[in-house]
């Protein structure tokens, strides 16, 4: 599913697409300045495009500098720290990229914690 519907109100892929779109809009990125991929694949049926393949493709297409954020996660974990910040970085740089800037998750950012506290009081 590429968008939420009554039949699939909690579609992970649709939520990731919408969250990413909203982040790109807030950052005033043009359509060709951002993209989406999916990591931590479990078998061949996982959601595509696969992050490792996209990192190679981007480097081969001449993208030299990459900023990476994982908006599906609110805290860093093995998937973000090891898969993205370590292996993803290595994959991109080995494929020809020059810089890989991993942007950490919200983690314990004060404004995020304040939001959670206020939301839990409702």
Q: Model-predicted segments: where are they?
A:
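Extended amphipathic ligand-handling, pore-lining, and cofactor/metal-binding catalytic surfaces
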Residues: 1-122
